[in-house]
Amino acid sequence: MNVPTAPTPNKHLNIPDLRFEKVFKKALHRELAPSSSLSRKAGVITKVVVRDVLLMPLLQSFVLSLALMGVKEWLSYIRLKGRTLGDRIRQRLFPI
């Protein structure tokens, strides 16, 4: 006889919704009040479009570019040290 077991809690990470339309509509519903006037709705739509389509990608790419510029010097230093360490190991293992 099969005994039903209690459902196990979902231990997986929730993946964020990356579909633009659903996220955009959710942002609009969050910003709009149900009894807003037409001019208020146009202003809110403009605000959401400017924020979600223009400003956030611009800000994200700016921060990523700054981070990559900051890491560039460190990565070139690590590459140089790795190359010299590799040369020393090769010379000790295979002397000419």
Curated annotation (Swiss-Prot):
InterPro entries: Atg43. Its main location: membrane. It is found in: Membrane. The chain crosses the membrane at residues 53-71. It comes from the Eukaryota. GO terms for biological process: mitophagy. GO terms for molecular function: mitochondrion autophagosome adaptor activity. It is a single-pass membrane protein. This is Uncharacterized protein YFR035W-A. It comes from Saccharomyces cerevisiae (strain ATCC 204508 / S288c) (Baker's yeast). The lineage of its organism: Eukaryota, Fungi, Dikarya, Ascomycota, Saccharomycotina.
